[in-house]
Regions:
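Short acidic, low-complexity segments enriched in Ser/Thr/Gly/Pro
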Residues: 206-240
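Oxyanion-binding/catalytic loops of NTP- or PPi-dependent enzymes
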Residues: 24-201, 212-220, 241-248, 268-556
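Short, low-complexity, Lys/Arg-enriched N-terminal segments of secretory-pathway carbohydrate enzymes
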Residues: 1-30
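Cofactor-binding beta-sheet edge motifs in enzyme active sites
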Residues: 263
Length: 556
């Protein structure tokens, strides 16, 4: 019999799918793993293994804690990198730009304060504490506590607060706007006593208060008789007084905040696995001048401890400079002269490389603790002032201090530019002012200064109602206006040779220059002449050489 007839409108019975070879999976798409995917998985596993192995070796950190600029460098498996740009924290090759961080700390207004005599029992998020009070009140309280070594608190005690801060380029940018809240050149004071002649001389140049510590135990770690930095804090809530308050901190606290800033950005610059596994630097090699005393070295170690380093090693700056140039790897005994002209100090050292141990022995040193790039900047500001006044401009009498700060920054940039170009311009603009003493010729108050290169539109029209002029600074102008400073800068060279045992200039095998101010062409020329035309080592960025040597000196 045939199949039953299909009724109209009734559903047709489904047909069985055709199966090839009788396999029920023949028509289903097969799950395939491509070779590219396999290779990607293998590569990822290999990268993970390499990253895990990368955690087994030590990455060293070296920091040049300078008077005006500081630099950090890391050494990973023999490869040294400088931490570049204190804003992004990115890494750069040795000699890269943007590595220097201004040794400047801008203190912020406290978020809270204690009443007099009140204790803060909650745990601190950081251990950055300070003492606050008016200048007069602090001096009275410190005098009172001088005879009370137990440091007991009283109802009239100053307030203890936690104060935030900004470090580096951001702080330097605020130096002109709020100089009373900005601290710099703290390295000149660290580890010294208040009665030290250098401290007393610095009192005339610093915009913040410096008072003697006679009040233990706060600020912590500050020895009795040590200088304390007082930063004006216009924050009336701190005290029941309408007078300006003063934040008091030891100099090593400034160093600690700079070191902490560099530590944080150095950790951000680490490779992916170390950065994301929460790696932190527990040890540090920090450079110090050869002439640092025991107290100054101890204060530097305290600053490193307050910055979060469990251990810190001190390395003398000229030794770090020689290591940066790889002179310690030479198989011969060598006599090296290191010339370090920084922003605030000049240090000259004669070293001898011991062939057997490949270590450097310091034979003699000399220097000038009050000669550096800042002195050249001030001399150039004087040169600029003379040129502007001869052109009919005068300085604003009501805000001369702020104008001086701006001029210093501008002339510093102009000075640095002369290391690469033959001349640089400074554009000054001012508004017309009434003539003084009945002089019918108008004068102009300078309100804008900025460095200017030749291709920077120097011939543009003046703004309406203002007069502008461009003053050109050449290398010869710099040499003539700073001739006395250049002579001072050469004097420690002969003194260091004498202190090293009357070493003859011809006995020097290598002359190494470091420090940002050693870029000055007149300095390099005079050094070469002092050693009978010998070439001066300057292939390593002088700004970063000491930090590179510090990072390379230990387990690298």
């Amino acid at each position: 019999m045939g199949p039953p007839p299909t009724m109209p409108g009734s559903p047709k019975s489904p047909k069985s799918p055709r199966r090839s070879g009788g396999s029920p999976f023949a028509s289903s798409p097969m799950l395939e793993i491509s070779p590219g995917l396999i290779l990607a998985i293998v590569a990822a596993l290999a990268a993970l293994a390499v990253g895990m192995l990368d955690l087994t070796h030590e990455v060293t950190l070296g920091i040049d804690l300078g008077t005006t600029y500081s630099v950090a460098a890391t050494c990973d498996k023999g490869e040294v990198s400088v931490v570049v740009d204190d804003i992004t924290g990115s890494m750069g090759a040795v000699g890269g730009d943007g590595a220097t961080v201004p040794s400047v700390v801008h203190f912020e207004r406290p978020a809270f304060a204690l009443a007099r005599g009140e204790r803060w029992n909650r745990p601190w998020k950081t251990d950055h504490t300070a003492v606050v009070g008016t200048t007069r009140e602090l001096k009275e309280r410190l005098r009172e506590f001088k005879s009370r070594r137990d440091g007991a608190r009283s109802s009239n005690d100053a307030a203890v607060v936690r104060v935030g801060s900004t470090v580096g380029a951001a702080a330097a940018a605020l130096r002109d706007a709020s100089p009373a809240l900005t601290v710099y050149d703290a390295k000149r004071l660290i580890g010294r006593t208040f009665d030290d002649p250098i401290v007393q001389e610095e009192l005339n140049h610093l915009p913040f208060h410096v008072i003697e510590n006679t009040w233990p135990p706060r600020p912590r770690d500050a020895a009795i008789g040590a200088p304390l930095l007082g930063v004006s804090m216009p924050y009336k809530r701190l005290m029941p007084s309408d007078r300006t308050q003063v934040l008091v901190i030891p100099p090593e606290e400034v160093g600690a905040r700079i070191l902490s800033h560099l530590k944080r950005h150095s950790e951000r610059s680490l490779p992916f696995f170390r950065r994301n596994m929460g790696f932190t630097f527990g040890s540090l090699t920090v450079s110090v001048p050869v002439g640092f005393t025991k107290e100054q070295r101890a204060a530097t170690l305290r600053a490193a401890n307050r910055a979060g380093f469990a251990t810190a090693r001190l390395l003398e700056e000229p030794v770090a400079a020689a290591i940066a140039y790889g002179l310690h790897e030479d198989d011969r005994e060598r006599t090296v002269l290191v010339y370090d002209l920084g922003g605030g100090t000049l240090d000259v050292a004669v070293l001898r490389l011991e062939r057997s141990s490949r270590t450097f022995l310091v034979l003699g040193t000399a220097g000038d603790p009050h000669l550096g790039g800042e002195d050249f900047d001030r001399a150039l500001v004087g040169w600029l002032r003379t040129r502007l006044e001869s052109a009919g401009y005068h300085l604003p009498s009501d805000d001369s201090a702020r104008w001086e700060e701006v001029a210093l920054r501008v002339m510093e940039r102009a000075k640095r530019s002369l290391s690469e170009v033959e001349r640089v311009g400074v554009r000054a603009c001012g508004d017309e002012d009434l003539a003084e003493d009945g002089d019918p010729e108008p004068t102009f108050s300078v309100y804008e200064l900025r460095p200017l290169l030749e291709d920077d539109g120097s011939q543009r029209e003046d703004p309406p109602g203002f007069a502008c002029t461009t003053v050109w600074l050449t290398r010869d102008d710099l040499a003539s206006s700073c001739s006395d400073l250049v002579d001072r800068a050469m004097s420690p060279v002969s003194e260091a040779l004498h202190n090293a045992g009357d070493v003859d200039p011809d006995e020097i095998d290598d002359v190494v220059i470091v420090g940002g101010s050693s870029r000055l062409t007149v300095i390099r020329r005079r050094l070469s002449e002092a050693f009978h035309g010998r070439d001066v080592h300057h292939t390593v960025n002088p700004d970063t050489a000491i930090a590179v040597g510090a990072a390379r000196s230990y387990a690298c």
